Amino acid sequence: ALYSSGRTKVILVSGDNPTRYYDEPGAMKKYLVRVKGIPASKIVPDRAGFDTYDTCVRARRIFGVHSAILVTQEYHELRALATCRMTGLDAVGVPDRGQPRDDVWWYGLGREFGSRLKMIWDVVSRREPTLGGTDDGVREALNSR
């Protein structure tokens, strides 16, 4: 709905990609194209978003993003927003409330305590994430039709 309503022009999907058989951003992109009908040219994968801190820093420094609408699990939204804002990214959040409150959801909620402690350490220590070179994917997606 965010793309079709014009609230966003490009979608940056971020996650881990340790092997060719496990590709979180690739899976997200396929879902958005096949199920939501979003043009593939408007979806940019970040395959080095190993954690929320890396994702926020990379969005700003590698992809040139200055403001973002974060869509994430409800239990993760506050930490994601705080992380992005503390790393210089102007962000607002939209929680995904569609996930059932099953064992996976409760596990995710439970690990938030440790994840929040790690986030504080990352921000305070200014940990340098895996960056790589700049990526023009977002700029190119903005210019595509």
Region locations from a protein language model:
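A structural signal for short, hydrophobic/glycine-enriched beta-strand patches
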Residues: 1-109
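A general structural signal for short secondary-structure boundary/capping elements
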Residues: 92, 114-121, 137-143
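A transmembrane-helix-recognition feature enriched in membrane-embedded lipid enzymes
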Residues: 106-128
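The feature marks non-catalytic terminal segments
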Residues: 125-145
